[in-house]
Design a protein with these regions (language model features):
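Gly/Pro-rich turn-and-neighbor structural signature
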Residues: 166, 264-273, 456-475
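Active-site core of glycosidic bond-cleaving carbohydrate-active enzymes
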Residues: 303-328, 332, 391-394, 398, ...
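Substrate-binding groove/exosite segments of carbohydrate-active enzymes
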Residues: 251-387, 414-417, 488-501, 527-561
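N-terminal export leaders
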Residues: 3-7
Length: 679
């Protein structure tokens, strides 16, 4: 065992002991499992999504060991009145399916959950006894388990329905007669509250009948929850086929691309789950594919921050076709609102593309869109898409340029937190996003044959903006040499991390110290503001990327491990979350995209410099000997990056395109290498 491997093991052991974790990564597997013991009662919630519906499952195990659940069903294509941001049809069902069953003419009783696992579906395995035949001599008889039930909950990939597959196995020594009744629960909504009238929400059992179950034999049946317009026929799906399609998406698509391999299984596994959550939540609307943040609120719509800025630049790396299509579609929608007078673009385009929301004014949306569109276009590696997006990038850059204050920073009404916290007349986020967009626009313009004078102007504007950011926002806050979030700001804010992600290093040491200091850092990541209690994962995720970007891999990895362990194996799993207390830590999906970008842009330091080229600045912690990212699908390619530490401290970096000779580089830690993929 090498010294670094020993350090890694000791660190993981110490961190695991620092707080009790509920879940474990299954040995030899990719899923997480909770083996239920004395750590009950416990409650949690998880969101899962398909192309035509989503659900939040509020589930738990009570003090007796019995499972409970409430299904919050969301149907984004069934619009309600008023048809605004939150107008998806939603309905909750807490139907207790096991209570409907009979075994030997008796009801199931005394459930004891054995384990719960999550792997693209939530699977619960429990043991059941049956009721007593009389109240005489059987009064004090301890119930004996006779049935093992495995229920698996998941969304359809393409249909507006939630599926639950139940498998019953006889664990006793005698045959059982199992009764599965015919059952339907049907609700018709008020026609005045639906854009197209009444909707029908229903839950149905499929596979009803009377069955004899020999010892150790199994049978299966299904529960299906769906909604449709009044007068339409309900769907009668093949639930086994729906489950196979869901697992093909999880294992055949998500697990097959952008595979992270490091000495830290917690980070590797959370990265896998974040890929899934980022990619699954895309709705097939009449306005095209739209990535949905989710959270029982945000569907069939797009936002300048969640989609354009956060998740769209990630999709080319994953290579998920629907993800790329949703990204391009979102930029097309924003481009509809370009105007010669340079009035602000809407913050959000809602209701399947039929309406807009701009209730917070200009949040710096043009900077968000320019930053995301330019990065996406470069990483996508498609000249046709880049040419289509270039006018949007140009327009947004000119808009930001026209919003420069006398101090040379970008003015806006607010920021992506929309007034929840003060942001002044010009905030740090908007200016750094504009700066990042200028950096990307230079190589993108060169690729497209834009006049050199225009790209030179963007480069000059970037240099001027970098100086203005330091002059206007830089200063001492809370005893740290860092940034004010806005003019007059006296409290540390988590968004001081933004200059780090765009390569502005003048105050990097003080900023990292401030981010990791007691004023902001908590067990749940960064507080939004010093002295408060509110946290939003998005700023923690940006900060982690930024700390890697400025070469402080050891400090970043310690925090990334702790954060990943809490989100993956703690009491609320398995994805990054939105915020607390707002939203009760909803599993908004774009945050998972930000988690993945910690790895692609932070740990591996990939910065697109062309449609087939990128800068690569690996930031590997001292405790790791090697790390790899396999089947990267960006730049129109399929390639691996492997980083190994050599005896004298240099890094051996291998870039291997599928079917081509690997390219090997050697570099000092912190050095950037220029990679040009084979045309």
């Amino acid at each position: 065992m090498t010294r670094r491997t020993l350090l890694t093991c000791l660190f993981l052991m110490f961190t695991a002991a620092a707080w009790s974790q509920r879940w474990k990564i299954r040995p030899g597997g990719r899923d997480i499992v909770w083996t239920v013991g004395s750590d009950i009662p416990h409650d949690d919630h998880i969101e899962m999504s398909g192309e035509r519906m989503a659900f939040v499952l509020r589930w738990g195990v009570d003090e007796r060991g019995a499972f409970r659940q409430e299904r919050s069903l969301v149907f984004p294509l069934l619009r309600t009145v008023p048809n605004n941001t939150h107008a998806s049809l939603m309905y909750r069902m807490a139907t207790d399916i096991p209570s409907l069953l009979g075994v030997n003419g008796l009801a199931l009783q005394a459930e004891r959950v054995e384990e719960v696992c999550i792997d693209g579906a939530l699977t619960v395995r429990s043991l059941w006894a049956v009721g007593k035949t009389n109240v005489g001599s059987a009064r004090d008889t301890k119930p004996l388990s006779v049935v093992e039930m495995t229920r698996t909950v998941f969304p359809s990939r393409t249909l507006p329905l939630m599926c639950e597959r139940y498998v019953l196995r006889n664990v006793g020594g005698k045959p059982l007669t199992v009764y599965i009744p015919e059952f339907s629960q049907v609700v018709t909504t008020d026609p005045a509250k639906g854009v197209t009238g009444s909707y029908v929400v229903r839950g149905d059992l499929r596979g009803s009948g009377t069955f004899t179950l020999a010892p150790d034999d199994s049978l299966s049946f299904d529960a299906v929850f769906q909604a449709c317009r009044s007068g339409e026929e309900p769907l009668r799906p093949d639930v086994a086929a729906e489950y196979a399609a869901r697992m093909e998406f999880v294992h055949g698509c998500i697990d097959a691309n952008l595979v992270l391999e490091t000495p830290d299984p917690v980070i590797d596994t959370e990265f896998r789950y974040a890929k899934l959550r980022a990619a699954e939540s895309i709705v097939a609307t009449k306005g095209g594919y739209m990535h949905a943040p989710g959270g029982e609120s945000y569907y069939a719509a797009i936002w300048a921050n969640d989609q354009a800025e956060y998740v769209n630049p990630f999709f080319p790396f994953l290579g998920y076709g629907v993800g790329n299509e949703s990204a391009l579609n979102s930029f097309r929608h924003f481009a509809r609102f370009m105007n010669p007078g340079y009035e602000p673009l809407p913050s959000s385009i809602i209701a399947e593309g039929d309406d807009i929301w701009n209730g917070a004014g200009d949040r710096g949306d043009a900077a968000m869109i320019a930053c995301g569109a330019a990065r996406y276009a470069l990483a996508r590696g498609s000249r046709a898409e880049a040419e289509e997006l270039w006018p949007l990038v140009e327009w947004c850059l000119e808009y930001c340029n026209r919003k420069l204050t006398s101090d040379g920073v970008v003015a806006s009404d607010t920021d992506e937190l929309e007034g929840r916290f003060p942001a002044g007349d010009a905030n740090l986020c908007t200016s750094t996003l504009y700066y990042d967009a200028l950096l990307s626009a230079v190589p993108l313009g060169r690729e497209l044959g834009v006049k050199p004078a225009q790209t030179a102007r963007y480069a000059a504007q970037a240099r001027a903006l970098a100086a203005a950011i330091d002059t206007h926002f830089g200063g001492e806050v809370g005893g740290y040499d860092t940034y004010r979030y806005y003019d007059g700001n006296t409290l540390l804010r988590s968004w001081i991390c933004m200059p780090l992600i765009v390569g502005l290093r003048e105050r990097s040491e003080g900023t990292v110290r401030a981010l990791l200091g007691p004023e902001l850092l908590t067990d749940d990541g960064l507080l939004t503001e010093q002295g408060g209690a509110t946290f939003w994962d998005r700023s923690t995720l940006y900060a982690l990327r930024g700390i890697y970007n400025v070469g402080q891999a050891d400090r970043a990895t310690e925090l990334l491990h702790r954060y990943s362990q809490r989100r993956l194996l703690g009491d609320h799993v398995p994805y990054p979350i939105e915020a607390w207390p707002e939203g009760s830590q909803r599993h908004l999906s774009a945050e998972s995209g930000l988690y993945c970008r910690i790895v692609t842009e932070g740990v591996f330091g990939i910065r697109p410099t062309g449609l087939r080229s990128f800068g690569l600045t690996p930031s590997m912690p001292a405790a790791w000997e090697r790390m790899s990212l396999r089947h990267i699908r960006a730049f129109g390619a399929d390639f691996d990056i492997s980083v190994e530490r050599e005896p004298r401290g240099k890094l051996r970096i291998t870039v291997a395109e599928a079917g081509k000779e690997p390219k090997i580089y050697r570099a000092s830690p912190g050095a950037t290498i220029r990679v040009k993929l084979t045309d």
